Amino acid sequence: MFLLILLSFQDRVYVPNSNKLPSWELGLELFRDNVAWSQKYPIHRNLYGTLLTQIQIEREGAVISRSAVKSCIDMLFNLSYPMPHVAFSQRPSLYLQEFEPAFLHTSVEFYRAEAEHMLERGDAAQYLRHVERRFLEEEERV
């Protein structure tokens, strides 16, 4: 509790005049640089690959821990992309800058292949029902 009071005081008194980041934002940057986006241990690459794999296997019908995937994606939204000369609040998130392009690419590839396979069967009504089901699944995933 004492640490919270001390950091709150520091954020109110010291930070505005020093051109430094508030404690929370500084903590996020330190976590990003030293853990999640470490140059020594490429955790972020493993994380992106694992998230994409989990989403892929869920699309294929397996049950995954959606709460774990959501927690990781929320973390990527909260971590800003490192841009030293841009204000913290103006920086895009790691999700938008790095993960989303890979996610969209794999989604396009998956649904393109699935659509080609479904259309080869030639049943338009079944294809439309399948597309509607996929829309609902993706909406639930969000």
What label would you give each PLM region?
Residues M1-V142:
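Eukaryotic scaffold/interaction segments
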